[in-house]
């Protein structure tokens, strides 16, 4: 039978942390106060921060907004390409083309192919595709470039961004 009490009675008390030499007090840290902190510098977090600042500016409200991003820089961990529908960007920045948004390549023809087991394919007519699969007016983009651009726009509005 295991004798737990006897096992613990053998602890070398000289190895136990000396409480007089240990201070539980943490060093004082710098504090920064913001009205809004957005966690995540992806498209959604940056868009939220931008919209809040735009609304505050339009209503003459002093609102401090901060974005905290885990990556070393904005867009550093967003590696995907994207078929981007610019409707939300039109609402955020109606003049996004003049501002140099990195939306350069318009989506071309839509084609949906059914691949069968023998390796051949059959094209499905576009008229049979749901509207969500039509890419007219959309762009082929690097999401990382768009995020970096959104970060620049946010900083111009006064959003503070802390990567890393």
What are these regions (language model features)?
Residues 1-32:
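N-terminal mitochondrial targeting presequence
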Residues 62-119:
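N-terminal FAD cofactor-binding segment of flavoenzymes
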Residues 56, 158-159:
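Secondary-structure transition into beta-strands, especially the periplasmic turns and strand N-termini
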Residues 33-66:
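N-terminal Rossmann-like FAD-binding beta1-loop-alpha1 element of flavoenzymes
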Residues 45, 82-85, 105, 139, ...:
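Generic structural signal for well-ordered, non-membrane alpha-helical segments
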Residues 132-156, 162:
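Short beta-strand to alpha-helix junction loop
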Residues 123-127:
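Low-complexity, highly charged intrinsically disordered N-terminal segments
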């Amino acid at each position: 039978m295991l004798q737990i009490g006897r096992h613990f009675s053998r602890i070398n008390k000289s190895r136990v942390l000396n409480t007089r030499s240990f201070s539980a007090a943490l060093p004082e840290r710098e504090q920064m106060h913001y009205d809004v902190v957005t966690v995540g510098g992806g498209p959604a977090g940056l868009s939220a921060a931008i919209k809040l600042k735009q609304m505050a500016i339009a209503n003459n409200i002093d609102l401090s907004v901060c974005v905290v991003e885990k990556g070393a820089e904005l867009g550093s961990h967003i590696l995907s390409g994207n078929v981007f529908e610019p409707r939300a960007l039109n609402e955020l920045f109606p003049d996004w083309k003049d501002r140099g948004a990195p939306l350069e390549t318009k989506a071309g023809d839509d084609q949906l192919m059914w691949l069968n087991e023998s390796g051949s394919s059959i094209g499905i007519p576009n008229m049979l595709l749901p509207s969500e699969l039509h890419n007219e007016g959309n762009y082929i983009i690097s999401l990382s470039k768009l995020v970096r651009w959104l970060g620049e726009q946010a900083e111009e509005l006064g959003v503070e961004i802390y990567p890393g």
